[in-house]
Swiss-Prot record:
GO CC annotation terms, alphabetical: host cell cytoplasm
Physiological role: Required for viral crescent formation early during virus morphogenesis.
Pfam families, per database record: Pox_A11
Disulphide-bonded residues: none
Mod. after translation: Phosphorylated by a OPG054-independent mechanism.
Name of the protein in question: Protein OPG137
Classification via InterPro entries: Poxvirus_A11 (IPR007755)
């Protein structure tokens, strides 16, 4: 295939001619369309040249007179000079035209899959592109030179971080607005929904769990309701266990004072060794079961009375 050298062009620009696409290198192959155009131009030039060398009308008329009307001394007759008719074969196939050649070349290009492999200047990347027809030349930088996988990944990561920061800022402002509205009672119809979230976060913070309101945004309302219901049940169960635990501590203090009164000095300090945490670990579930069987509910008044009585029993000798 004939190659046409062109001037040196920078590798970071894709060189394209109108209505055709070429590989971005220095040598360009002549396509079938260009070959058909050149053939048509050559045929037109040949026809013009042949038309220019045809004899003038005077020469043609004199030649006809000489052939049809010979001199008197010529032995030939007119009939002998008349040319015999030539038999021609008519071909129905239309002669090749420029438009037909273009259609044939386009169909051939559509059937063939042409791939042009472009090697970048630094031989770092190989780009495989399919030739396509474009109506406008472009100056887009070559992918083989500009495309950097690591750089694009870093840019995408930075963009994700920026989007997360924007989203977190928006959510924090919304949470602040919700908190102020609840605080001043401006949106009572939403107070219950947001109070559940705040109660969940407060319960998590009391137990040393790093949870924020933003973390609950991924949960649906049904999930928030189930979490809040579970926490409420656990809280009521814990209150019942605290009531039974306070009763046990008061009884242990009274028994300790009675044994000390009877002379058992070794029992001294028993009430200080038994704390609410130990009771909760050892017999916490049993305390909850006992409270449930006795029908002891979450009574704030009873819990406060038992708490005060526990403090006084530890300090005052009843017996």
């Amino acid at each position: 295939m004939t190659t046409v050298p062109v001037t040196d062009i920078q590798n970071d620009l894709i060189t394209e001619f109108s209505e055709d696409n070429y590989p971005s290198n220095k040598n360009y192959e002549i396509t079938l369309r260009q070959m058909s155009i050149l053939t048509h131009v050559n045929n037109v030039v040949d026809r013009e040249h042949n038309a220019a060398v045809v004899s003038s009308p005077e020469e043609i008329s004199s030649q006809l007179n000489e052939d049809l009307f010979p001199d008197d001394d010529s032995p030939a007759t007119i009939i002998e000079r008349v040319q015999q008719p030539h038999t021609t074969i008519i071909d129905d196939t239309p002669p090749p035209t420029f438009r037909r050649e273009l259609l044939i070349s386009e169909q051939r290009q559509q059937r063939e899959k042409r791939f042009n492999i472009t090697v970048s200047k630094n031989a770092e990347a190989i780009m495989e592109s399919r030739s396509m027809i474009t109506s406008m030349p472009t100056q887009t930088p070559s992918l083989g030179v500009v495309y950097d996988k690591d750089k694009r990944i870093q840019m995408l990561e930075d963009e994700v971080v920026n989007l997360r920061n924007q989203q977190s800022n928006t959510k924090s402002s919304n949470n602040l607005d919700n908190f102020t509205r609840i605080l001043f009672g401006k949106t009572p119809y939403k107070s219950t929904e947001v109070n559940k979230r705040i109660a969940i976060v407060n319960y998590a913070n009391l137990n040393g769990s790093p949870l924020s309101v933003e973390d609950l945004d991924v949960c649906s309302e049904d999930e928030i309701d189930r979490i809040y219901k579970t926490i409420k049940q656990y809280h009521e169960s814990r209150k019942r266990k605290i009531i039974v635990t306070n009763v046990i501590i008061i009884v242990i203090n009274i028994i300790e004072q009675a044994l000390l009164k009877l002379g058992f000095d070794e029992i001294k300090g028993l009430s200080t060794d038994i704390t609410s945490e130990i009771i909760d670990v050892e017999i916490g579930d049993d305390c909850d079961a006992v409270a449930s069987k006795l029908g002891i509910g979450n009574s704030p008044v009873l819990n406060i009375v038992l708490f005060i009585l526990k403090i006084f029993v530890k300090r005052i000798k009843i017996i």
